[in-house]
Every structure is written in C-alpha cells, then in structure tokens.
Amino acid sequence: MFSKSRWLLKDLARLCTILKGVTYSQTDVGTENGIGMLPILRANNINENQLNYQNLVWIKRERISQKQLLQAGDVIVATSSGSKKLVGKSASFLGGKIISCGAFCAILRPNSLINNLFFKYFFQTQSYRNHISSLAKGSNINNLKNADLANIQIPVPPLAEQKRIVKKIEELFAVIDKTVKSLNDTKEHLAQYR
C-alpha cells in the first residue's frame, strides 16, 4: 500500500519554521482574562501528546510577537525540563484560541512540504523519542536547543502518500477508540453483577 522508495530524509529545518517561546518576567504576569493579557502554555501543559489549558500563565500582550501567536497545526515542544523524560514532549495546537507558549518551549510551524497531521504524528513516534533522549543535555536541567531540533531528520514521502498514511493512522485510532469504549462499557456491565 505504501512505497518507501520515494521517501526522502529531510532536516526538520526544511519542513518547518522553528520559533522560540515567549520570554517574560514576573512583572509581565497578570490575572486571567485581564485587559491586555494573553495566556501562555508551558511545558507542564503538554500531556500525552495533547495540550491542556489548565494553570496557564497570563502575560502582557506586548511581550508576544505576532509570529509567536500559535496557529492551527503548530507543534509545541518542551525544550527544557528537570527531567530528561519530559524534554521533547510535544503536542499539536488545533487552533481556536489566541495563545502562545513560554520560553521553555519551541513552536514548530510546518510548511507546505509536509502535511500538518503527518508532521504531528512524527512527534509521537518512538524514533523521535529515542532521538530526543540522545540529544538532551545538561546536569540539573535537560535542554534541547533549536539547532538540535533543526537537525532532526524526518522520513518524508510525497504529499499524496503522507495523506494516505494519515488516513490509515486515523482509521486505526478510530478502531482503538471504539475498542476502548467497548471495554469500558463491558467493565461497567460486569461491575453491576458484583
């Protein structure tokens, strides 16, 4: 079904723009929904390849450049943490909010050479995690530099094949979701008989 013969290894820097998250100080921090304030995602808002919007920091809008505002399809990567396990964790931003991320995160904005969903799924692979583990550096805080991200190589098939792969992945996820729901329903039914 899929042909790897036309796949090319491409550096991440050729497939996206890599942006640093917003640097801010305590004097820039304000209250939730305050006038002139925008929310900031931090590394702790990335959980199991999803963004959670709890415990956001709100900072002055003027601290955030236009290009640092997240766009649908952006992938947010944690670039610094006290734990090597947390460095490199990522999630895709689906849109619908005016928001950015903090300086301990990077924003990866895919270009037209790669399908947004194919790009997103790459960051969920064991190959990506292994690569990040080998790159994470530092004694007290593990850091991932933008240059480290830029040099990650991604196997990239032609766009039409990327779309077919994404379609297949999403079909399989739908089967998994249906199976999990069925198992949970069965557990509930069994619990009634105990």
Region annotations inferred by a language model:
Residues 13-29, 44-75:
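Sequence-specific dsDNA recognition surfaces
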Residues 125-154:
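Specificity-determining recognition surfaces
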Residues 1-23, 151, 155-159, 163-166, ...:
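Non-catalytic DNA-recognition/assembly elements of restriction-modification systems
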Residues 178-181:
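Heptad-repeat alpha-helical rod positions in long coiled-coil/spectrin-like domains
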Residues 56, 103-105, 149-151:
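Short, solvent-exposed beta-strand edge segments and adjacent coil->beta transition regions
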Residues 25-33, 134-136:
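Short coil/turn segments at secondary-structure boundaries
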Residues 42-43, 62-124, 145:
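A short beta-sheet element
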